[in-house]
């Protein structure tokens, strides 16, 4: 949802996901998150596992470990929520009552931000989101705070040699929004910003180039949940051409050697809704639904010699692991081709550990990843801890009060680069594992 709201902008130069933090929502009472910024003192696997941008190194892959229910999935869900808030800001700013009755929009607007539930004081406090990205070697930091459905604060800064404030908002009212530098052209239109809408989203909607560039990068982030095996792969016209299918088959055949080809049929339905004829220059919200049918072709044999092929419904006859693999492959290759960031929840779900290692390795290889794509994934697979930097690994831990914290492996004392990290993790040295002592 949201195709056509924020203008397409060519992706220039080096683009990098740096960090995402969230506070007072889900299990996150305090502001917490991860960063891909590598620590200068850690030299292990520096060349293989990091990119260098303007003298700083950033990790290609970040792994998030933790017990079930510790907040790993909630962390990725918070990023998705931030993206939806950006889209909903433009929808709300359109002041179009018919648009608000569209089922998908109505459902999203009826799902307010939930504050941390296990501290009664948090209900009356703001929920906070912050994201950092590098575009054309400039670090942009965008944050906002929301309470009772209204934007209380909003801040956008950029930094190359020094930090410059581009947006500073100190209340829900548009009169309390200060715009500078690349956002100055939006000053004469700032009155369209509602109390429940983000200023940066509205500036992008009204064709401010800087706002569009930043939000396009944030909206390009894909979040995949590997547990949703029942869903069809996320296919469209661009990722089902002959070349793309060949790329998928190369890896699918590892799981199913009888597989010879895939047939993908797409049926698209697009609903277009005019946002506003006056204020928003006839911009449209496009809700696109694609029905996907996948047939797999398999070799048939007689006396161990191939004699033909048989066509089978992919989702019915393939294993859960093979289905999950096809579900994630398009997103992986799109990220690698575009140099964008992919977030995967439960990356090992249904896949053999060697396959997970193989797919993750695509992001570490200069040959398959020349465009600086990044992978952020949650996992329980300890085999992935082999050959990683200590600052690539994060642990989520939930305390007795229901509060989730996230801590980098490199922040733990007495952890050396040659330690058996997997063994220490399973022994509970870093926490972030189920507490089974009370059952003994």
Regions found by a protein language model. Give the residues of each.
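Short, well-ordered strand-loop elements centered on a beta-strand within folded domains, enriched
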Residues: 17, 140-162, 174-181, 270-297, ...
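Short, surface-exposed charged micro-motifs
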Residues: 33, 130, 141-143, 284, ...
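Conserved P-loop NTP-binding catalytic core
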Residues: 55-57, 63, 67, 76-141, ...
């Amino acid at each position: 949802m949201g195709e056509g709201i924020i203008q397409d902008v060519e992706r220039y130069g080096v683009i990098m996901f740096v960090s995402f933090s969230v506070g007072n929502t889900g299990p996150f009472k305090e502001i917490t998150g991860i960063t891909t910024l590598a620590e200068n003192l850690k030299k292990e696997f520096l060349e293989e596992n990091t990119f260098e941008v303007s003298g700083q190194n950033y990790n290609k892959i970040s792994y998030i470990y933790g017990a079930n229910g510790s907040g790993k999935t909630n962390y990725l869900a918070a990023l998705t929520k931030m993206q939806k808030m950006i889209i909903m800001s433009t929808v709300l700013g359109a002041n179009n009552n018919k648009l608000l009755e569209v089922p998908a929009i109505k459902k999203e607007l009826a799902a307010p931000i939930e504050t941390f539930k296990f501290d009664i004081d948090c209900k009356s406090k703001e929920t906070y989101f912050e994201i950092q990205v590098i575009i054309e070697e400039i670090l942009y930091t965008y944050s906002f705070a929301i309470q009772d459905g209204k934007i209380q604060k909003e801040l956008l800064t950029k930094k190359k040699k020094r930090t410059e404030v581009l947006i500073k908002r100190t209340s829900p009212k548009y009169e309390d929004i200060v715009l500078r530098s690349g956002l100055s052209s939006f000053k004469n239109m700032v009155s369209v910003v509602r109390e429940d809408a983000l200023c940066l989203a509205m500036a992008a909607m009204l064709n401010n180039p800087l706002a569009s560039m930043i939000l396009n990068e944030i909206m390009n982030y894909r979040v995949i949940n590997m547990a949703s095996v029942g869903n069809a792969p996320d296919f469209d016209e661009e990722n089902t051409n002959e070349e793309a299918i060949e790329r998928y088959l190369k890896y699918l055949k590892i799981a199913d050697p009888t597989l010879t080809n895939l047939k993908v049929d797409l049926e698209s339905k697009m609903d277009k809704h005019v946002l506003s004829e006056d204020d928003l220059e006839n911009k449209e919200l496009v809700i696109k639904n694609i029905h996907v049918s996948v047939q797999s072709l398999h070799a048939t044999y007689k006396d161990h010699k191939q004699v033909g092929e048989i066509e089978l419904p992919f989702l019915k006859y393939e294993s859960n692991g093979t289905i999950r693999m096809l579900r994630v492959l398009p997103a992986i290759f799109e990220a690698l081709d575009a140099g964008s960031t992919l977030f995967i929840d439960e990356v090992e779900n249904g896949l053999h550990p060697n396959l997970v290692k193989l797919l993750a390795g695509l992001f570490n290889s200069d040959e398959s990843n020349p465009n600086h794509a990044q992978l952020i994934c949650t996992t329980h697979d300890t085999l992935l801890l082999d050959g990683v930097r200590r600052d690539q690994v994060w642990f989520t831990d939930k305390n007795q009060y229901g509060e989730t914290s996230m801590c980098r492996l490199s922040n733990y004392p007495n952890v050396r680069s040659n330690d058996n990290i997997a063994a220490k993790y399973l022994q509970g040295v870093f926490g972030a594992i189920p507490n089974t002592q009370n059952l003994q």
